[in-house]
């Protein structure tokens, strides 16, 4: 295995009664994007804050390129950068001022800090907004200035805490492109997200966390296979054809079919073995079968597994052994 | 101006180009870790920029001191010294000290509101001398205190204040006052970090500052007070600050009081500076 950029074992953080992070292990190989996927309140931000030396763990330990985040915090700080979930830039200052500030604080002399700020603003497409206060920036621009501030001193490890939450799709794609460029350069990125497709697009390995614990970890392929290929959503014209459609879908897809509260809607969850292409093939076959049987379909769609579905699948699986044991 | 602002708000920004990004990412030599002085001054520069962007925040160091000076001179002047001008010679150094000490509490309030913002997370992940963010704050506040001092002095001179110590004495007195205020402000940075809301910071500050400034030698000669009150006034640091400042402005430097103020400042800084940094590191 290649060198580890981030290594955490048994990391714990307790706030009062709440075990926000409850024994997390992570191994992130250098030069990769690692996705930490989980819903709000799962402990993602708390975990990132401990790794970035902002919070002191109550238990366990973590190292960044071999340096302990508590005992060698200063050495860790010279290697990492953090783009927090909420803008980690000063909203009262302009784009240029923010970058010059960080440049000065990382030891650049004034002319060098100015030059670096201009260069970064240009590369991030923010030259026109350079003289405006960040509070007047759009969400996408804020993210960009934030990431620009984070890479000003070319960190070895970059933490991105929900970098695209609240962004429109175009800005989101731009942030993704930025992340890809950063990784190509050799920086290791740890990214937290609530969106499976974001982790899918960017990360090579993913850890799914829930209630402070890692509930699944692996490459994208492994994780997807364990979760399922997605779901086929069908809406019929006639409600009385639904039971017939259900039977047909169960037969052709060999899938679990759920009847929605809407009397004309039903959803089939595709099993995990099929690849994505297989899922599409299966779905179109099922559509053909429905037509042949004379069932009128109004809408038909193939959805990627959503985070909800990932969760359902993963938590179901962890719940099952306990039930069978009881 | 407004039309360009509207145009700029339209999100027609060019997407970042991968080759440009690659260019800025090419490993630059990381510069040497900056010195404690350099980072403190940089944070001071940040405070100045904030004043530049929101100049209204100077209201508390301009209008408030003018109001204090006018109010107390004309309110008490006739009764206590026969005439406002007469009283002003006694009051001005004191009202200056009390106004500056009063506005030090805004330091705590701004620390309290600022620390919750994400930008502090970034500062705290930088490999820099830890107290520099706080020191920078106070450097910015020193400018505010200086503005307030000059405003009060200006109003005083217009109203007939004639300091015997001349330019040198007055300048030295203001310097001593600023140095003490720098140390004194760490009390508020501590409360700013300790308390949960800016309202509670305000409440605590008022509760400390009102007795400290009023139960002192600022407005009247302590000899007229009952013994138990004199005892408090005598140990009140504000009394010593005012005595020192008064002596310097009148040209009759009181070495004992000046030394007392410098030592008290050092002690306050050592205690509250340490407490502030403890809280800052734990936050």
Short names for language-model regions:
Chain B
Residues 50, 82, 162, 213-270:
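Membrane-interfacial helix-loop-helix junctions in multi-pass membrane proteins
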Residues 67-72, 88-159, 180, 184, ...:
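Hydrophobic alpha-helical transmembrane segments of multi-pass membrane transport proteins
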Residues 3-9, 15-21, 26-27, 69-73, ...:
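Alpha-helical transmembrane segments of multi-pass membrane transporters/translocases
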Residues 16-17, 22-64:
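Aromatic- and glycine-rich beta-strand/loop motifs that create alpha-glucan
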Residues 130-205, 252-279:
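Alpha-helical transmembrane segments and their short interhelical loops
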Residues 55, 74-84, 212:
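Short, hydrophobic transmembrane alpha-helix segments
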Residues 59-64, 196-217:
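Pore- or pathway-lining transmembrane helices of multi-pass membrane proteins that form conduits
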């Amino acid at each position: 295995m290649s060198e580890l950029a981030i290594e955490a074992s048994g990391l714990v953080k307790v706030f009062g009664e709440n075990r926000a992070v409850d024994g997390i292990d992570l191994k992130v190989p250098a030069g990769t994007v690692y996705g930490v996927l989980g819903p709000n309140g799962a402990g993602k931000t708390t975990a990132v804050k401990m790794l970035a030396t902002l919070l002191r763990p109550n238990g366990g330990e973590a190292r960044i390129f071999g340096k302990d985040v508590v005992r060698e915090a200063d050495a860790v700080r010279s290697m990492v950068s953090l783009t927090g979930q909420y803008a980690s830039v000063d909203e009262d200052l302009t784009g240029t001022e923010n970058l010059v500030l960080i440049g000065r604080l990382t030891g650049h002399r004034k002319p060098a800090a100015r030059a670096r700020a201009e260069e970064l603003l240009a590369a991030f497409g923010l030259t026109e907004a350079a003289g405006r206060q960040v509070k007047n920036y759009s969400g996408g621009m804020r993210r960009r200035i934030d990431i620009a501030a984070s890479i000003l001193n070319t960190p070895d490890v970059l933490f991105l805490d929900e970098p695209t939450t609240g962004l429109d799709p175009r800005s989101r794609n731009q942030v993704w492109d930025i992340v890809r460029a950063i990784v190509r350069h050799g920086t290791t990125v740890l990214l937290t997200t609530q969106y499976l497709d974001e982790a899918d697009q960017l990360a090579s390995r993913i850890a799914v966390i829930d209630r402070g614990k890692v509930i699944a970890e692996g490459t994208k392929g492994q994780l997807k296979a364990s979760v399922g290929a997605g779901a086929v959503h069908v809406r019929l014209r006639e409600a009385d054809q639904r039971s017939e459609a259900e039977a047909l879908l169960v037969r052709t897809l060999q899938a679990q079919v759920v009847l929605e509260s809407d009397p004309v809607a039903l959803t089939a969850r595709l099993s995990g073995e099929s690849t994505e292409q297989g899922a599409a093939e299966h779905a179109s076959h099922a559509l053909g079968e429905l037509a042949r049987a004379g069932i009128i379909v109004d809408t038909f769609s193939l959805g990627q597994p959503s985070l909800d579905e990932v969760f359902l699948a993963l938590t179901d699986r962890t719940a099952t052994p306990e039930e069978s044991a009881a | 101006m407004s039309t360009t602002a509207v145009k700029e708000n339209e999100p027609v920004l060019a997407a970042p180009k991968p080759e440009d990004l690659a260019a800025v990412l090419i490993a630059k030599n990381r510069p040497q870790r900056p010195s404690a002085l350099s980072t403190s001054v940089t944070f001071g520069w940040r405070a100045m920029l904030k004043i530049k962007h929101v100049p209204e925040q100077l209201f508390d160091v301009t209008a408030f001191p003018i109001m204090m000076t006018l109010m107390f001179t004309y309110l008490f002047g006739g009764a206590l010294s026969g005439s406002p001008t007469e009283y002003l010679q006694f009051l001005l150094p004191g009202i200056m000290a009390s106004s500056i000490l009063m506005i030090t509490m805004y330091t705590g309030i701004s620390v309290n509101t600022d620390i919750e913002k994400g930008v502090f997370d970034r500062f705290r992940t930088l490999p820099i001398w830890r107290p520099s963010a706080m020191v920078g704050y106070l450097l910015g506040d020193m400018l505010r205190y200086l503005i307030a001092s000059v405003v009060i002095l200006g109003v005083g001179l217009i109203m007939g204040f004639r300091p015997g110590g001349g330019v040198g004495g007055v300048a030295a007195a203001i310097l001593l006052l600023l140095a003490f205020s720098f140390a004194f402000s760490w009390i508020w940075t501590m409360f700013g970090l300790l308390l949960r809301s800016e309202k509670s910071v305000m409440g605590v500050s008022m509760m400390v500052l009102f007795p400290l400034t009023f139960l002192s030698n600022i407005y009247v000669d302590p000899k007229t007070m009952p013994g138990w009150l004199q005892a408090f006034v005598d140990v009140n640091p504000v009394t010593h600050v005012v005595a020192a400042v008064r002596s310097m402005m009148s040209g009759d430097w009181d070495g004992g009081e000046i030394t007392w103020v410098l030592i008290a400042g050092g002690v306050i800084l050592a205690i509250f500076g340490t407490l502030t940094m403890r809280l800052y590191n734990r936050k």
